[in-house]
Amino acid sequence: MQERIAKVLACAILGPIVMLSAVRPARAQDPSTPYPNMAPLDQYLMTDVNSEISLARSAAPSSSSEGAEVMVLGRSGYTTAAQGRNGFLCLVERSWGAATHDRDFWNATVRSPVCFNPAAARTYVPVYLMKTRLVLAGRSKIEIVQAIEAALDKKDLPALEPGAMAYMTSKQQYLSDEAKQWHPHLMFFVPGDAAKSWGADLPGSPVMAANDPEEGLTIFLVWVGNWSDGSPAPPTAH
């Protein structure tokens, strides 16, 4: 998912954050992308289920992730590999969590562990799971965007609940070739283009925003000082 906000990442690691244009609509399409097409599916899969479970749980502190449901990616999509008891859901996003025009959309190296709280698990994750099924079915980028848009319009996908948020604090994350590990952060999901109402991206504001027209929401990011294992994150400022 962090790959979906690649423009946020690029701005953050290069200097002061400027107003971004995307969570999925991150960067403009780069015709020289090294990933013009989907790689063989095996390159996106993790061969050891336990390793994927562990990586998924590393997205959040164990106080939340140990009781979370965990989903892992297989040839037909994500399936539950560990039952949960606290309503949280952890998984490792792949590159197609990005905007369809993002240069890393087919980057098979991307591994983005995310732990969603109950509200996000119920109402945000279904969009990503649908997108995954479309990818694995061989749908084109245009078809993916159209299918998601139609499902949202027809309310085949749930409306985003208030309070939906997620942890991305895994030291093992690889978010894109540009951002790589980046920085531990929290994400908050809000319907529509809501950046101004949160005071995001203003001078001195700790809140970054990425508008996502493909899914009709804004993702707000707030850096935190430690990785999920408690170790300090590198000092960075925006």
Where are these predicted regions, by residue range?
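N-terminal secretory signal peptides that target proteins for export/translocation
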Residues: 1-7
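Bacterial N-terminal signal peptides
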Residues: 10-21
